[in-house]
Amino acid sequence: MKDQIAMLASNRKENSVIPDMNILENMYLSEHTLSAWKPAISKKKEIERYKKYKEMLNIKANSCEDLITSLSGGNQQKVFLARWLNTDAEILLLDNPTQGIDVGAKAEIYKLILELAKQGKTILINTLEIPEIQKVADYCAVFYNGEIIKILEHQEIDEMTVMMYSTNAAQAEEGK
């Protein structure tokens, strides 16, 4: 965050949700963490920003004072995206950003990722969902045994090609 990098961790229930905190507190957790580097914002300003992100991300919540656990998984994920968008980071690391959420929420997150990329943000996505990669990626780095084996351009990304490189089948064929 300090160096303009933000990360949306996978498994939101273990890595992001603070169940005893409300939506607003969960959304601004990073803001309070950053207060050592910059002045904290007022509750009024937090609520204004909450309303902005609620509309922008289509977060379905009755009140910002409701517990985060009252939201669906997709809406929780949007709150955590707002948490990091609020930092205005230049680089976003998204680890399985649509894992365990409904199709509608996935589409909204894809739209947001594309919009952020248009704004010049660098977005690195870790996912096993190849259709997700096809929708939002300019490039796809395929790993095998912890090393990048191949970098595919957007038009090269398809399930067969990604699977071939990720299982090292392409290198086995080239070695024959």
Predicted regions and their residues:
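Glycine-rich phosphate-binding loops of nucleotide-dependent enzymes
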Residues: M1-K176
